[in-house]
Structure formats: C-alpha cells, structure tokens
C-alpha cells in the first residue's frame, strides 16, 4: 500500500469521523464518549512523527474508513449533509493555513488546553467548552459559518453546542493534516478509486 496515500486517507477518515459525530449530536443531542474522546484527542497532537500518532483509537478510525467508503463509493450510503459539512471544513482550512496570526493563536490556545488536561479528562465539560471557544474565536471568523442542521431542541443546549464546535475543531485538525500530506479536493473526484481501495485495505489492518 502506498504509504503517503494511506496516511492521507487516514486523515480524511478523521475528518469524516468528526463530522459524522456533529451530525449525530445535532439530531439526537448525545454522543459516544469514546468516539468523542478519539476525535478531540487528535486536536492535541500538534507535532506527530506520523499520521498514526494522531489517530490512536483504531475502532474510531475504522468508523472513519467506513464513512470514506460511504461518501466516495457508488452506494446509497452517500450523505449530502456530511458532504456539505466537509466542503465547509475544507474551505475554512484553506483560510486558516493562509493566516499566520490565526495559526499562532490556535497553537497557543491548544497549548493552554493541553495544560488543563493535567487536571481534567478530554471529555470534561470545561475542556470541551474551551475547545469550542477556540473554534468560535479563531476558526469561525475565517469565512462563512457552517450551518448545522438538526433537532432545534438539541441544538439549543449549551453542552451540545460546545461539543459540536469542539468536533468541528477536530475535523479542522484532520483537514490541516490531510492538506499537509498532499490532500487536494480534486483527489476526491479524480483519485476516488485509489482512496476507496486504500480505505478498504485499511479496514483489514
């Protein structure tokens, strides 16, 4: 298996895994603690030696690979809403990587959260609120806001709002890595078969 394509597909799976949780939260108001932790932990790995260092929860990653197959494959599983969120994240990522001040501020704020983890778990409400505020303060202002669809009663709850923003930050982290590994939007069209084949093989690892 081509290692660069494998790593890139891993990062793309990370984006989709975070986005799918956003969708589920918006509709149902609840999240799987392990999946949430897996996505949020990726935000804090800022100097990885490999993509595998970022995605250490293999069960969560496998869900991401399945989402890659659903979204890029010729199946009825393709989800237009997931695609819309993906397009929004990739557009914001382009703006973030062009903003030196935004990147510097992001690094500093993530360091603050890392220090907080000496005392709290990654899924603690205060930590989630801080990750959400990073998204609101730095990412959200870069371009058009991503409009989240779902159950209005769920979306009104502050903890749900915080989790959604924290997960969008996790999706952004994976999008940055995907781009650093050479990912381009045109690959999702012209290299679709190679990405699907890589995701299928990765599911067996």
UniProtKB/Swiss-Prot annotation:
Its main location: cytoplasm. This is High frequency lysogenization protein HflD homolog. GO terms for cellular component: cytoplasm; plasma membrane. The gene is hflD. Belongs to the HflD family. Disulfide bonds: none annotated. InterPro entries: HflD, HflD-like_sf. It comes from Shewanella sp. (strain ANA-3). Keywords: Cell inner membrane, Cell membrane, Cytoplasm, Membrane. It is a peripheral membrane protein. It is found in: Cytoplasm; Cell inner membrane. Pfam families: DUF489.
């Amino acid at each position: 298996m081509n290692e660069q394509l494998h790593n890139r597909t891993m990062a793309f799976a990370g984006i989709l895994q975070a986005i799918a949780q956003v969708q589920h939260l918006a509709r149902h108001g609840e999240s799987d603690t392990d999946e949430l932790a897996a996505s949020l932990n990726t935000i804090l790995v800022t100097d990885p030696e490999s993509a595998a260092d970022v995605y250490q929860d293999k069960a969560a990653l496998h869900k991401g690979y399945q989402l890659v197959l659903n979204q890029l494959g010729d199946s009825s599983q393709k989800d237009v809403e997931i695609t819309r969120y993906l397009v929004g994240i990739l557009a914001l990522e382009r703006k973030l990587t062009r903003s030196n001040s935004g990147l510097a501020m992001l690094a500093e704020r993530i360091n603050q959260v890392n220090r907080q983890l000496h005392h709290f778990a990654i899924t603690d409400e205060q930590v989630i609120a801080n990750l959400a505020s990073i998204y609101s303060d730095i990412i959200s202002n870069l371009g058009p806001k991503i409009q989240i669809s779902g159950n209005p009663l769920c979306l009104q709850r502050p903890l749900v709002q915080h989790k959604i923003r924290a997960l969008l930050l996790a999706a952004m982290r994976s999008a940055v890595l995907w781009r650093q590994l050479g990912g381009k939007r045109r690959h999702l069209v012209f290299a679709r078969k190679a990405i699907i084949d890589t995701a299928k093989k990765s599911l067996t690892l």
